[in-house]
């Protein structure tokens, strides 16, 4: 069977265009791939179109809108999740319109499908006292406690996203003045973030203890789990929640949900308040 035009464009979009031309992160590519998996299943199970027979001309506005309604109704997707799925489809059809000009009108009609408005949750931030209590919880007498102490300190000090923290390697760290870490952010954009003196000392001790200050270790994970691998998102959330739970027993004001993004927002608010 001859490949359909839809299969050719989806494959090129996911395996070549996003990574080679747009320099999109592997996590974003995976998220986009998941959207097409859902779309193919919807076309097969709801629309009765087998994946191997799905053609580009069949992906019209009515089908995309039906797919988005299906996500909300059958899969109970939140409006924000629906919008993320739509953003992936918008990226694909923005690519297709330049590859297949005779499909430009079809693509632009899909690009005109609006994002759904929804209330955005307010992200709180911690007082300096609450933050200090959390950062004081790791037990510096244990190896794991020392790792947690520097991890939490960097999470706050740099305002790093969780994935940025996961991706850190010793080669991204500069301990000599001006001390800083190099973070790979969204859109594969690199930025250098300065470090406070206390964080620098914690980080220096961590790297020396784990022999990460040697040149041959510069591509290794800066923070590792018990299997000597990079920490996962759930692993970092677990570490944070463990120490937040202990801090709550000492400070009644810590009665809110604290996530890694809370520390990122806290850093921004502290900088703002300090002028």
Residue ranges of predicted features:
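Conserved catalytic core of the tyrosine transesterase superfamily
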Residues: 1-275
